[in-house]
């Protein structure tokens, strides 16, 4: 049985004061880590403080991206060594906004995935199709290609620890979401790709999230599906009450 993982991606929202207030409100109310992984992926500036404020609790802290190098002349970047030193647990890699706005490629995402494992971070690896690709019937091919390239060079044991987030690009922040059945079909296809590349055991162990306009009102429909093990949530993770409803839904799946 795969443990659900509900991760809030705050993107570029909140001040430090607001972030700390949020964490203080929810950290004692999230489900036990043994039942659900409850994660907040916050802006870099807040990570140190939030990790300190959540030590000893069941709320875990993640980053939204990172560089693949440990150090070097990469102005403005943050390395996996820095994140690990802060006590960060998870890192989102290859989000469509990073791919579209900051020229991330499948190759750079793969370098980051390998670096995350080298430094003991758990990658949340994003994949998903555009509306044009979906309408052209290319969803499975696009997602399979992204997953295969992102996981290249990993061992089956590493793949078991990874998280994949299927986020159809047309559903991110639009209020539109895939149907639970359609999302499950794509997540099942992702699992079959992992099985082909790394074996049935790795495919059975890897956790696959759905993302794209997930909110308290629809999360249970997604979590009830066979191949969906959690959610990567944007806007609905910004308010404490909403986030708590999301992670509580994970507890009952």
UniProtKB/Swiss-Prot annotation:
Known EC number: 5.3.1.1
Keywords for this protein: Cytoplasm, Gluconeogenesis, Glycolysis, Isomerase, Phosphoprotein
KW Cytoplasm (keyword) present: yes
InterPro entries: Aldolase_TIM, TIM_sf, TrioseP_Isoase_bac/euk, Triosephosphate_isomerase, Triosephosphate_isomerase_AS
PROSITE patterns, per database record: TIM_1, TIM_2
Main location: cytoplasm
CDD domains with a match to the protein in the record: TIM
Pathway: Carbohydrate biosynthesis; gluconeogenesis; Carbohydrate degradation; glycolysis; D-glyceraldehyde 3-phosphate from glycerone phosphate: step 1/1
Keyword Protease applies: no
Modified residues (Phosphoserine): 213
Example of a GO biological process term: glyceraldehyde-3-phosphate biosynthetic process
Gene3D superfamilies reported for this sequence: Aldolase class I
Any matching Pfam family: TIM
Enzyme active site: 95, 167
Reaction(s) catalysed (UniProt annotation): D-glyceraldehyde 3-phosphate = dihydroxyacetone phosphate
Gene Ontology MF: a single term: triose-phosphate isomerase activity
HAMAP family for the chain: TIM_B
Its biological purpose: Involved in the gluconeogenesis. Catalyzes stereospecifically the conversion of dihydroxyacetone phosphate (DHAP) to D-glyceraldehyde-3-phosphate (G3P).
Name by which UniProt lists this protein: Triosephosphate isomerase
Lineage of the organism: Bacteria, Bacillati, Bacillota, Bacilli, Bacillales
